[in-house]
Amino acid sequence: MALRLGAVAGLTTVLTGLPIADAAAATSSSFGTGGDGQVIHLLARLTSRTDLDLGAPGFDQGDEEVFTDDLFRGSVKVGYDGGVCTVLIVEPDGSSESQCTATFSLPGGQIAAQGLIRLPATGQAEFDIAITGGTGKYRKARGHISGTFLNATDSQIAIHVTH
């Protein structure tokens, strides 16, 4: 899931130390809906982004980012996502908080999610947002999506789905 608004206040230089190929390959479930829940581990790679400077000039409240990512399990593309984030707060130290909504298109259906994402001025940025619904295999989906921004284009995500 993208969230890089204006290079995200230095996130482009932050790496987890985990090789991207290893992060994407760390999967533990299929795309089926067996049992009461599953975790889908993916690598989200940015494919397009538009930053909209809607407030005062510069990075501030009201600015938006519209994005799409390709979703990978290992080296195989398994879907895509798209969404928009609106900046709510920019602190004097450069940290910020945005309201984000995104839809993940996967084999068998879509998963919708939203939540607040806090980006520190420096250091690792992580997020945890609510699954708000779905279609197809995911029509009764609930749960959350957690993730870590690895660099300016890649995020490691885990979709925790309950039915």
Residue ranges and their predicted role:
Residues A24-H163:
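Beta-strand-enriched cores of mature, soluble protein domains
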Residues M1-A25:
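Secretory targeting and sorting signals
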